[in-house]
Each structure stands twice: as C-alpha cells, then as structure tokens.
Amino acid sequence: MKLTALSVDGFKNLKGVSLIPDPSYNLILGENAQGKTNLLEAIWTLTGCRSFRGTRERDYLPFSGGNLQVEAKFQDARREQSVRLCMVSGTVPEKKIWCNDIPQKSSALFSVFHCVTFTPEDLSLVEGGPERRRTFLDLCSAQLHAPMLGLVRRYQLALQQRNAVLKQRLPEAQAAGLLEIWDRQLEQLGTEIAVQRGIYVRRLAEVCVPLYAQIARGRETVSLHYQSSVFGEDAQDTLPEMRTPELVQQYGEKMRQSRSSDLLLGHTASGAHRDDLLLAIDGKPAKEFGSQGQKKSLALALKLAQAEIYSKRRKESPVVLLDDVMGELDEARQAVVSTIVQEMQVFVTTCHPESLLSPKNGKRFLLKDGMLTGDVENRPETA
C-alpha cells in the first residue's frame, strides 16, 4: 500500500500542504511545533481510527478557526483509490468522508487504508496499564480480522449495561434475570474477542521474539503471554485449539460464578475487559524490571512485528509512520528498522536529519509554520 498523493488544509496548523510522496522513503523535516507530527496525524485519520495522539476530533480543526480537508490517493494491491475527509467547524463539528467519491462512515475507512505508527508514546505499550495493551491487540487483530472492532464496541456496550444493573445493588434473585440477558451477550462477544487476541498473540510472539533478539543483539530474551481473566495465562496456546461452543460455555460459567461478588463490587470483575498482554525480559516483567533502553527496544519490536505480520498476512505492506523516534535509536537499532520496512512506504519526522541512517533514495519535505517551504529535495541524507 502506497500513498501516491496527499493534500492537507486546515488540519491543526497545516495550511495548503500538497505533496507527491516517494513510494519508499519520505523524511519530514522542521523545528519543533512546525507541524511534522500533525502531518502524520492527518495521514492516520484516513484509517478511520482515533488519533494515535489521543486528540479529540474537534481539535483537528485549524487553530485559527475554519474548516479542514484531507485528501489522498493511494495504491493498494488491486487498484488506485481515493479518500477525502472534510470537517466543518461549529458547536458540533460536522465530518464527512468520501471513498472513491462515495460517501462513507469513518468505520468503512479501516478496511480500506492501513498504517502502522511508532511514536515516543508507544513506550506506554510496556510501561502503561493493561488497557493500552488490549487496545493494541484489538487494533492489530482488526487489521487482519475486520469484524474485531465491531465485536469490541458491542462488548463494551453490553458491559456498560451489565454494570448499570450491578450498580443498582438489587438482591441477587431480583437481578438475576436482568444480568442473564447481558451475560449471554458478553459470553459470546467476550469469547470471540479472546480467541482473536489469542490468535494474534501467537503470531506476535513468533515475529516479535526474534526481532527483539536482533535489536538487543542477543543480550537478553523476551517472551509474550496473553493473560485472559476467564481462560487463564498463556491463553494464546489454548484458545485457538478449542472449539468455540466449549469456550462460550466456560465463559458463561465464569460470569455466573462471579455474579454474587460482582453485585457486591458494583461492576464486572472478570471478562475480556480485564485481559492483558504480559511482556517479560529474561523471565521478569518488563514493566517493573526492564531498563528504559530495554523497554524502548521492546516497544519498537512490537510495532515492527505489527507491520511485518500485516505484510505477510495481507500480502501487501502498510504505510509506516515514524514520529520523532529514529533519531533516538542507535545505528544498530536503526538498521533493524530499515531492514524490516525496506519494502514499505515510510514517513519519518525529525528535527535532526544528521542523526539518521537515511537511504540514498527518497524525498525530503521541509515544514515551517504548517506549510511546505522551498523545493522538495531528493537524497534526504544531504540535509
């Protein structure tokens, strides 16, 4: 998958940005706060997903007021496609999307255009809480299994309804009928989510473990385990091998066993919303015992594995967005990144191009005050 044309106007501080990207390597230069990350974020919006920076959609609108528009053409494995996103400012901003000139919802974009990002915030994959890793697993799974995001949304809605019943603190006999309605939905949805996570963690471990060994130059080993609050630790080994009806029954039994304690707590204490991806370095939890360098290497290995898995399973590469991270890596780690993404289209932002191992070919774009300045130049290493 390659972006062949991009036009951005009114996205935060970006004004009239129009470029023809290189099919391989694109270096986005500029001082801090000039719009480099905003440009990557504008590309990311074309996936239909929430911002990788956690930005609210209304905050995409230009700082000075007005409307925004992001337009792109891209080539996938079959054909060239186009996508256009417009947002009109107002008390409630109005967003419109067209894919190949046909009006669409944001959710439709996810199955059309795919990116993999690596940003400084991705260190939270290792240092953050379980929710961050669950979100990562669900997004990665959805890139290969399109219904996944819908499953997660429906699960969350059913969970909210079950928790609303629990918060009423009704006697168990009175609450049982209401809870049974939501338990039935949660056991079906939760099982499907857990199975997809288990399948993905198995694939992730197969790719991430050797990648980390490359990045760490064999100094230590990493291990990944899918911990399910219903199906136990190492669920990536057991879930894909079991029949779905048996798993649904097991999930339902867990829900009914915890009903009394859930009523006392006022919330649902077990289920897919309590799962985690356990990350260990030399057998010890990476979050507690890993050094900053080890955590950064592990986060990098996870994101590179995501890109490699997507490429192998989908038979085409995602667009890769590297936001202000390459300059922080030593030459050995940069070389690993370059090897993994060499067949992919990459956008790299930096303030310090001299710190990068840049390929001989590619394009360089200079951003200042939200606008492209000067001519686009080849050979990014000459900056």
Name every feature range the model reports, one short phrase each:
Residues 1-31, 173-319, 328-339, 345, ...:
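Conserved NTPase motor "head" modules and their coupling/switch loops across ABC/AAA+ ATPases, GTPases
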Residues 72, 345-352:
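Structural recognition of the conserved hydrophobic beta-strand(s) that form the central parallel beta-sheet
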